[in-house]
Amino acid sequence: MSRPPVVARTLPALRRALAELRKRNASVALVPTMGALHDGHLSLVRLAKRRADKVVVSVFVNPTQFAPHEDFGSYPRTFKADASKLAEENVDLIWNPDVKVMYPEGFASKILTEAPAVAGLEDSFRPHFFGGVTTVVGKLFIQCRPDVAIFGSKDFQQLRVVTRMAADLDLGVKVIGAPTVRERDGLAMSSRNVYLSAEERAIAPTLYRAMKEVAKRIKAGKTIASSLTAGAELITEAGFVLDYLEARHAETLAPIKSPKEGPIRLLVAAKLGKTRLIDNIAV
């Protein structure tokens, strides 16, 4: 029978729980989440268990990474179900602060990064996003002091930005990217998939199929530009409104025009109805 994890909602409670976990020099892994947990999140937890003695999962819907017109108010909040899933995975500690705990009255600081990985892609369409992400992740690292932190590769640009921030600020956290977990039809698992209607859900895997087609063309010797154009046509013809479909250097996320320039990562973001989906694959 699974043992329920400790749930901390205040900083003193978190510090007490972490001190208990760290007895006998136990290593700690952090899995930052916004809740609404699915199998993709649980795969991060399982990787965390392989990389550290103790596992902490944060469940916090971070308001600073949402613009006023975005879905902060409607973002799914399912803490009871989340806690049950984490208990089944034998997570040691859940950090579930209120917004007022994370951002108390008078809070006026922000962590920003000017890393090349920030430029374009998500930053072009959600310019508020990375300032909110780096600030909350920086706070989580400082609060929890993990040895390692696990992030999903579905948010590939975020993974690169957080990795750079942790290194630049000497936070002492090894950031590990976990593989994207997909549904059987290829759709990347996401908490926002619940927004899709049945008709939209049937169309959604087109994003993944289009990226695979782009990768196939590039490997066959077609130019990156023509391959991206073909992929974009597949996406828009399926009914998406495309934000971007780009080829970037897999490490730096600099724009890339030829396979000779280095390893390629394809990244895509598009709206299907009211739902915005992102995904990426290696070439």
UniProtKB/Swiss-Prot annotation:
Q: What is this protein called?
A: Pantothenate synthetase
**What extra comment accompanies this record?**
The reaction proceeds by a bi uni uni bi ping pong mechanism.
Note whether Transferase occurs among the keywords.
no
Provenance organism: Rhodopseudomonas palustris (strain ATCC BAA-98 / CGA009)
Reaction catalysed by this enzyme: (R)-pantoate + beta-alanine + ATP = (R)-pantothenate + AMP + diphosphate + H(+)
Extract the GO molecular function terms from the UniProt entry: ATP binding; pantoate-beta-alanine ligase activity
Chief location of this protein within or outside the cell: cytoplasm
Gene that encodes the chain: panC
The UniProt annotation places beta-alanine binding at: 65
For this chain, the family text in UniProt reads: Belongs to the pantothenate synthetase family.
What residues bind (R)-pantoate, as annotated? 65, 158
Active site, renumbered = 41 (proton donor)
Give the E.C. number(s): 6.3.2.1
InterPro entries in the record:
Cyt_trans-like, Pantoate_ligase, Pantoate_ligase_C, Rossmann-like_a/b/a_fold
Pfam families the UniProt entry points to: Pantoate_ligase
